[in-house]
């Protein structure tokens, strides 16, 4: 859930430009769908990048690097020779957001988890054939891709269970795998960063788009199916949370921000079911005004992830100021180069 689409079309009038931006923003923020134990016949296998690349300081740096290195993977991630040890017995599988990749969303956090002693894996899911950016297609099918990848990781590492960390669409997609596709027995801890748990209204833009005949169909074609699936009240969101937003046997943790630019009201990030813990960045560090777009590049958030996955060994997160709106310019530029 990454791209902000800023319409540069001319001659369409202000109304058309505003609608284009509104629907694009509303869609780009929300992503997720259903995962399955078996991958649908004829659906392309997920791309698994293995060309290790350096950590980046922000989304733009990762996008620029990927332009010349489309198979880039976060350093140390997808080492299928990695053997989990007694201190870190469960592999960690990362799931990127919309219009993104394993590298653009995890170039910073991935290596930190590797350095902490975890076996870490990440796929590029939900892309069209030949795509260089992913997480744009039907999330249900993406979840099927993810399920197959979890099976591969468990088989290769001989791990009974894994931990999952999903960002934005990746949070909902992985939660669908856990809750709806029978993935719970294979998962110990699920972590959702900037999770659009109950979708978003994008400061009122989503309800407006939902009232305009054909607007969401246009959005699916111009932005992506996955984006539109995560608007508050969409059929996908209703399906995902029907019967409760958690299932027994899995530890659930969300990490969100009060100033998330894409998920408003921010309370839509929180899970309500048994076994859920909801961490708000500003409750732990009031000076950190990280929002949606900087979430996976905020060192404090990375420290929170380590704390959740390895509470006995992770250092205490260090609170440092982060300015409101950090990361937005980089995402806008990165989405238009």
Tell what function each PLM region has:
Residues 84-88, 114-115, 156-157, 165, ...:
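Extracellular/periplasmic catalytic domains that process cell-envelope and extracellular macromolecules
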Residues 248-337:
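C-terminal catalytic-base region of ester-bond hydrolases, centering on the histidine
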Residues 97-101, 132-139, 225-227, 289-295:
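Second-shell loop/turn segments in exported
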Residues 113-130:
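Conserved alpha/beta-hydrolase
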Residues 99, 127-129, 197:
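Alpha/beta-hydrolase active-site loop signature
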Residues 95-96, 120, 140-241:
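Serine-dependent carboxylesterase/thioesterase catalytic core
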Residues 102-104, 130, 201:
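Short N-terminal helix/helix-N-cap motif within the alpha/beta-hydrolase-1
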Residues 2-116, 320-327, 333-337:
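Flexible, membrane-associating and regulatory peripheral segments of lipid-active enzymes
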């Amino acid at each position: 859930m990454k791209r902000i689409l800023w319409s540069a079309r001319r001659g369409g009038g202000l109304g058309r430009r505003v609608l284009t931006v509104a629907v694009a923003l509303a869609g780009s923020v929300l992503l997720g769908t259903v995962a399955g134990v078996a991958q649908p016949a004829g659906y392309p296998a997920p791309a698994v990048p293995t060309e290790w690349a350096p950590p980046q300081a922000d989304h733009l740096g990762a996008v620029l690097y990927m332009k010349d290195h489309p198979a880039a993977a976060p350093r140390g991630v997808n080492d299928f020779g990695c053997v989990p040890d007694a201190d870190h017995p469960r592999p960690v599988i990362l799931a990127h957001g919309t219009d993104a990749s394993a590298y653009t969303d995890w170039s910073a956090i991935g290596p930190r988890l590797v350095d902490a002693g975890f076996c870490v894996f990440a796929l590029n899911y939900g892309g069209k054939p030949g795509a260089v950016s992913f997480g744009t297609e039907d999330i249900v099918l993406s979840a099927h891709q993810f399920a197959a990848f979890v099976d591969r990781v468990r088989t290769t590492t001989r791990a009974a269970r894994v931990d999952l960390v999903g960002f934005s669409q990746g949070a909902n997609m992985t939660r669908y795998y856990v809750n709806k596709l029978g993935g719970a027995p294979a998962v110990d801890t699920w972590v959702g960063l900037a999770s659009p748990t109950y979708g978003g209204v994008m400061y009122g833009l989503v309800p407006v788009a939902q009232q305009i005949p054909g607007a969401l169909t246009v959005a699916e074609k111009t932005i992506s199916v996955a984006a539109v699936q995560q608007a508050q009240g969409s059929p996908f969101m209703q399906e995902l949370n029907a019967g409760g937003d958690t299932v027994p046997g899995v530890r659930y943790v969300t990490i969100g921000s009060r100033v998330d630019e894409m998920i408003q009201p921010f309370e839509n990030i929180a899970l309500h079911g048994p076994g859920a813990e909801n961490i708000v960045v500003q409750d732990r560090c009031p000076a950190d005004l990280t929002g949606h777009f900087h979430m996976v590049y905020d060192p404090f958030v990375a420290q929170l992830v380590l704390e959740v996955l390895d509470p006995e060994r992770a250092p205490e997160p260090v609170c440092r100021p982060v300015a409101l709106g950090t990361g937005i310019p980089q995402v806008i530029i990165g989405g238009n180069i």
